[in-house]
Amino acid sequence: VQITGDFLPTQKMQTPYGEFDAPGVADLIEKDGVWEFTTPEPLAPELYSYTMLVDGLKINDPSNVHRIRDVQSVSDVFIIPGERADLYSINDVPHGTVSKIWYNSPTLGMDRRLTVYTPAGYETSGKRYPVFYLLHGMGGDENAWTELGRASQILDNLIARGEAEPMIVVMTNGNAALQAAPGESSLGFTAPSMALPKTMEGSFETHFPEVVKFIDKNYRTIKNKKSRAIAGLSMGGFHSIHISKQYPDMFDYVGLFS
């Protein structure tokens, strides 16, 4: 019985495409019916993920119900508190609201699902807010930033610290052939996949003004370029740069995370 996780040193692996760093693996020790692993040194504050290997078969830790999904990979997680890791935790601060909303896209010919974060106090403040459009990477969906990336916890904590301005954050589904994340549309419990059609051929970028129009109509936004930002991870960065290029009057801030 072994454990593999991002708190272990990586190991070099040879492949037909060259050498790369593979996740580290360590043996678990059985003691009184409990399998244990002790790190050589205390772990630094951070959010860590791991899985277990039983005779080479990957399984999740049956004693840990806290898990994240990254495309088809499901891992157990834990947080060592302190420093940056406190941003990922639910702390005693005002909390925003996360909503799953459907909008119609004539360009893509379907109703589509997105995630919207509104900051603490939005419901009663009467204020208008800037909007940050946050796009996921390849294989992700509209759930990725909140479920995998803990975006709502990070935003709550940054805003409470005064390190971020209260804002609306919109997290779309960048897979233009799909309505929503696996299990969240009429397709049923489909398997997540990296190999989806219409992810980077321009359809998602072309339809994006429909998202902005929907958000401006249904939320108290500041409806101008200088109050909008767009950024994304990996494929989301690709989408961000091309959306900002295709619609230069839409966003004053553009970020590429990789």
Language-model features, listed with the residues they occupy:
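Aromatic-rich carbohydrate-binding modules that target alpha-glucans
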Residues: 1-45, 55-81
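Solvent-exposed loop/turn segments at secondary-structure junctions
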Residues: 9-10, 108, 137-141, 174-178, ...
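Short substrate-entry loop that stabilizes the transition state in hydrolases
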Residues: 122-182
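Primarily recognizes the serine-hydrolase "nucleophile elbow" in alpha/beta-hydrolase
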Residues: 150-153, 210, 217, 222-258
